[in-house]
């Protein structure tokens, strides 16, 4: 059934808004790469399974980073997959380091960049050492903001630095790999770090930024709500407020509310069904559950609807032990 939004937009605008061309190009590439396997099932079934996986959000599993960040839907799907696969970390009350969370991210995306994980951890840890422990919920909501709004935050960081230095507010901000959050943060003793910038002026710049750029931004009304509650704030104070804001989490729509983060009955039922199908696995997990706080390096995975497409990627992901495994988390 077509949504009212679909009917209100011209065809070409709706296709562009939903990034349909991106998925068509990816589907055709996979069709060509796996044509021998697909020929025995049929092209029509392949496209049906591919777009069903896109709708279900499983199409991003074990894919390259350039693909999972290509569209807002891909980013939201990756966030949801990370939560569903590893929420047992939070359910067990385990605290992990930034490197350990990065290992988990690489199980779903082998080439996931360490830099993004570090930025998410910085939102939680602020000025603590990067090897400090973090709860799953704290890291997840910080990671959600950093990953989904990464381009927006690059420009926000550049605006913040310009306000601190008193630069012309009409300067156009172009996010690059060497700008924004990559800039050297002020020393702890600096007045700019302690006092931040004026919230009203900061909001004016952010409002213009949201109007000017097409990439995903938090709803301006919610950003205004955050900034209207303070007179001054720091950059990382702003990121913390974004990560903890209930309305922004709802607007993004990838994760449940914090109170429901550990509950996923559908996933629990599916995992139980999969575990029963593997002889001896349930007894093995029960016997070793107290000896290990981290989930297995090869946890049960939600299979792609089109198995030949992802078989090689799964093998690559399972053989890519690029980071060390932690046997026990600190308490």
From Swiss-Prot:
GO terms for cellular component: centriolar satellite; cytoplasm; microtubule. The keyword Phosphoprotein applies. Keywords: Cytoplasm, Cytoskeleton, Microtubule, Phosphoprotein. Residues 318-331 have a biased composition (Acidic residues). GO terms for biological process: regulation of protein complex stability. One of its GO terms (molecular function) is protein-macromolecule adaptor activity. Residues 1-225 are annotated as: Required for interaction with TPGS1, LRRC49, and TTLL1. The modification Phosphoserine is found at residue 319. Residues 292-331 are annotated as: Disordered. Belongs to the CSTPP1 family. Interacts with PCM1. Interacts with TTLL1, TPGS1, TPGS2 and LRRC49; the interactions link CSTPP1 to the complex TPGC. Binds to alpha-tubulin. Regulator of the tubulin polyglutamylase complex (TPGC) that controls cytoskeletal organization, nuclear shape, and cilium disassembly by balancing microtubule and actin assembly. Regulates the assembly and stability of the TPGC and thereby modulates polyglutamylation of the microtubule, which antagonizes MAP4 binding. This is Centriolar satellite-associated tubulin polyglutamylase complex regulator 1. The lineage of its organism: Eukaryota, Metazoa, Chordata, Craniata, Vertebrata. The gene is Cstpp1.
């Amino acid at each position: 059934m077509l949504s009212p939004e679909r009917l209100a937009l011209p065809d070409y605008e709706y296709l562009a808004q939903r990034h349909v061309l991106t998925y068509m190009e990816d589907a055709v590439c996979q069709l060509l790469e796996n044509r021998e396997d697909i020929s025995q099932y049929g092209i029509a079934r392949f496209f049906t399974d591919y777009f069903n996986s896109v709708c279900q959000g499983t199409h991003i599993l074990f894919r390259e980073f350039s693909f999972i960040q290509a569209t807002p839907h891909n980013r939201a799907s990756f966030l949801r997959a990370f939560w569903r696969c590893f929420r047992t970390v939070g359910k067990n009350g385990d605290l992990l380091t930034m490197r350990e969370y990065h290992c988990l991210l690489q199980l779903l995306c082998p080439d996931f960049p360490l830099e993004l994980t570090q930025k998410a951890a910085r939102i939680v840890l602020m000025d603590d050492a990067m090897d400090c422990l973090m709860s799953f919920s704290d890291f997840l909501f910080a990671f959600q903001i950093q990953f989904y709004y990464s381009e927006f935050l690059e420009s926000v960081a550049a605006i913040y630095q310009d306000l601190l230095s008193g630069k012309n507010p009409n300067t156009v901000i172009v996010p690059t790999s060497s700008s924004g959050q990559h800039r050297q943060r002020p020393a702890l003793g600096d007045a700019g770090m302690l006092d931040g910038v004026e919230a009203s002026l900061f909001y004016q710049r952010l409002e213009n930024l949201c109007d000017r750029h097409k990439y995903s931004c938090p709803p301006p009304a919610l950003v205004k709500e955050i900034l209207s509650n303070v007179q001054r704030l720091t950059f990382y104070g702003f990121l913390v407020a974004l990560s903890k804001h209930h309305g922004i989490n709802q607007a993004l729509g990838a994760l449940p509310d914090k109170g429901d983060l550990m509950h996923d009955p559908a996933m629990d039922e599916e995992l139980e069904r999969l575990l029963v199908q593997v002889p001896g696995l349930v007894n093995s997990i029960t016997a070793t559950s107290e000896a290990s706080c981290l989930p297995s390096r090869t946890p049960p995975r939600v299979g792609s609807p089109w198995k030949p497409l992802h078989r090689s990627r799964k093998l690559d992901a399972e053989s890519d032990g690029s980071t060390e495994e932690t046997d026990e988390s600190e308490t």
